[in-house]
């Protein structure tokens, strides 16, 4: 449904990158990628109906001018840009309203400059708050996994301008595929400050293993349920 996507850039862009971290391969086979494909194919029949229902709810609540999906350019492995997919949680043209919010609210501006996000973002819709709290807005990223842009486990995907804040830590980020879940998501998420999150991404890239990925995947549902209040 191409016309239903709100997109902010072209996925054909690239950035210069040098990833000095080894890949997880055994006998020429990318085991992590093979596992991602297998898990995505198993989950897709379960996830797709949920995505369709949520997409319909977003379209109904937004009216004819709203879009159900949102895509934004993120930096992938080796610096390749890709369109990261989400269910839309903000009002239409939300980015156009951000400068006014930051200009009139010094506290919000300070929070944005520190964390590159707002904990209580006024642009998020009522339904969007529920989707974010439960992380259901990220379900469409299963298609990013199938396309090879993302993995189930890895660093949080970030835009190009935000990656510049990583300094030399960006090479750790660029050595792996971004993930739907990861060390940051299961270690406090909103309670973890920005620099600590970057440190987690570096540590994951250096010590990544199949066993660790399985551990993060196993912890993710429990963390989501606890954060959602169930």
Regions found by a protein language model. Give the residues of each.
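N-terminal hydrophobic signal-anchor/signal peptide
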Residues: 1-47, 110-113, 171, 204-208, ...
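An acidic site on a long C-lobe helix of protein kinase domains
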Residues: 30-33, 46-49, 123, 135-138, ...
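Flexible glycine/proline-enriched surface loops and loop-helix/loop-strand junctions
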Residues: 35-38, 122-124, 198-201
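Residue-level signal for short amphipathic helical patches enriched in basic/charged
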Residues: 45-48, 134-137, 153, 189, ...
């Amino acid at each position: 449904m191409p016309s239903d996507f709100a997109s902010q850039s072209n996925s054909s862009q690239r950035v210069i990158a040098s990833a000095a971290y080894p890949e997880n391969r055994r006998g020429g086979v990318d085991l992590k990628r093979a596992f991602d494909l297998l898990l995505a194919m198993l989950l897709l029949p379960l996830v797709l109906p949920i995505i369709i229902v949520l997409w319909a709810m977003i379209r109904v609540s937004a009216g004819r001018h709203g879009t159900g999906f949102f895509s934004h350019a993120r930096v992938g492995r080796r610096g390749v840009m890709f369109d990261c997919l989400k269910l839309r949680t903000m009002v239409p043209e939300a980015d156009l309203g951000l400068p006014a919010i930051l200009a009139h609210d010094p506290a919000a501006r300070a929070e944005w400059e520190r964390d590159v996000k707002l904990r209580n973002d006024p642009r998020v819709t009522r339904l969007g708050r529920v989707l974010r709290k439960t992380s259901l807005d990220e379900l469409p990223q299963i298609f990013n996994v199938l396309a090879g842009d993302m993995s189930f486990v890895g660093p949080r995907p970030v835009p190009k301008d935000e990656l510049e804040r990583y300094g030399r830590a960006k090479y750790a980020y660029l050595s792996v595929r971004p993930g739907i879940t990861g060390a940051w998501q299961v270690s406090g998420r909103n309670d973890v400050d920005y620099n600590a999150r970057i440190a987690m991404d570096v540590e994951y890239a250096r010590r990544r293993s199949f066993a660790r990925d399985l551990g993060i995947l196993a912890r993710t549902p429990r963390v989501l349920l606890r954060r959602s209040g169930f």
